[in-house]
Amino acid sequence: MEKKFNAATTQRPHGERMMDAAMVTIDLRSFTKQIREEKAWKESDRNAITVFKTYGMRIVLIALHKDAEMIKHTIDGLISIQVIEGEILITTEKQSAELGPGEMLALHQNIPHNVLAKKESIFLLTLTTTLAGKNFQQYDQKDMD
């Protein structure tokens, strides 16, 4: 497997980081510190960094300030959200779940949802990225009753 790196950008000028290889170790403490030190965190209500990206899957570390909201959206893939710090509220059209440190939520594709930070929060978003047109079990809002 070819190793893939993310090149430095104006957002993250301190060099490249490993994005994909046969095995990738991810230092969440280091990435959490990094996103809290970046200009985006200081000047907006959120910041995020992709810590792994390969065909079919992406892992993103997301930081939200208290009361920051990711407005209603859908994702064409399965997702999991795992809270590292803080507390978030995830709301679909029919259900809500408050998650704290050590708690997770899994959500099927194309379910409209939003995320609200009840406290300053850090969480991992893992998502599949190749479901479009695939024959997977389809769920929609009515299945969430």
Give short role names for the model-derived ranges.
Residues 1-56, 140-145:
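A short, N-terminal "cap"/entry segment at the start of jelly-roll beta-barrel domains
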Residues 3, 26, 118-145:
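Double-stranded beta-helix
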Residues 43-45, 58-75:
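Conserved short histidine dyad/triad with adjacent acidic residue
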Residues 55, 84-85, 100-101, 119:
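A cytosolic small-molecule/anion-sensing beta-strand core signal
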Residues 66, 76-89, 93:
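Glycine- and acidic-residue-biased ligand/ion/polar-headgroup-sensing regions
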Residues 70-72, 90-91, 107, 112-118:
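Short beta-strand His + acidic residue motifs that chelate non-heme Fe in jelly-roll/DSBH
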Residues 93-109:
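Short acidic-glycine-tyrosine-enriched beta hairpin
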